[in-house]
Amino acid sequence: MSADIRQAAANAADAEVLSAAGTRFLVQAYGNVSRADDLAVHTEQYFGRDYIARELQAPDVSYTIAYDADQIAGFVKIRRGTTPDAVPAAAAIEIQQLYVDAGQQGRGIGRTLMDHAVAAARDEGYTGIWLSVWQDADWATGFYEAYGFRRVGTAEFRLGRSKFMDYLMWLALDDVS
């Protein structure tokens, strides 16, 4: 990762900037395949300032932000306590969101955020990490597979009226050096 990129744990004061960045990153990822009204509803529900503020207070959720100077270049959101049946371990955390700004991709930011998630999972005694990723997002699926994740199932993801099929992916921490 570039020397001018830094990471920080998010806190309540970050709700507004996380809301704006999450909305921007979601539109970058899904804007050309989703209806504008569906994106608007989804971003208000899951990236609205009030929603993010509540999540930043929740004990089972944590965000880590990657900054380039004073701008958010990406973030990872970790959720504890949810594991689908397809995941081969009960003691797993979920990477619920990992986004890197489209203009910042290729700089190692995603890998650094993933390394942070792996370290957090290990520190907290988990045996693995799971996530879901849109099946047509070859760039994201390729990133996760290169990191060591493997596909263990599928799930439907709804973004308003738009339906997407996601891969459920699993990473055993014993497989990561």
Where are these regions (language model features)?
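C-terminal "cap" of GNAT-fold acetyltransferases
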Residues: S2-D4, N11, A89-I93, T127-W130, ...
